[in-house]
């Protein structure tokens, strides 16, 4: 089974995953997030946690098209992005302060000499619409605890209060779709 972790950063999911990121990490197998080195219909699973929001909408369509190309029919795409809807609700209800959501919504990352920032936000409706427009089907919100990567603590497991996975509110929008 071919499983790709695209935008993995420093997180190493082990030998059963191919690690892809534009950064400079020892465990990387490839750097091209557009997966040009992969044959069409050759990948079973693409997972990307909190990388997709660094793209604007046009870049997102291009990337989804590239990922669609390499996924096998019935292949799975699993995306995790900051959940704009949940964070907005928490803020409007007075459950969190603006300072608590600035990082998740407007995050930044150092990529060598360059600093990159989030370029967009998503709620379930906007992300599922985008996925459907790019050819994906059967879009739904997945439960991170039920995945084969649940033991790897990444931002798909982001909660407010921070790390309160039992009583907190999940602020990551975790969506799965099929080719």
PLM segments and residue spans:
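Residues at the starts of beta-strands that form the adenosine-phosphate
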Residues: 2, 16, 138
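Conserved class I S-adenosyl-L-methionine
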Residues: 2-9
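Adenosine-cofactor binding site in Rossmann-like domains, unifying the SAM/SAH pocket
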Residues: 10-40, 143-144, 148-165
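Local beta-strand N-terminus motif with an aromatic residue
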Residues: 43-44
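A conserved beta-strand element that flanks and buttresses the S-adenosyl-L-methionine
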Residues: 47
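Short catalytic micro-motifs in class I SAM-dependent methyltransferases
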Residues: 50-54
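S-adenosyl-L-methionine-dependent methyltransferase catalytic module, highlighting the catalytic core
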Residues: 59-66, 72, 76-178
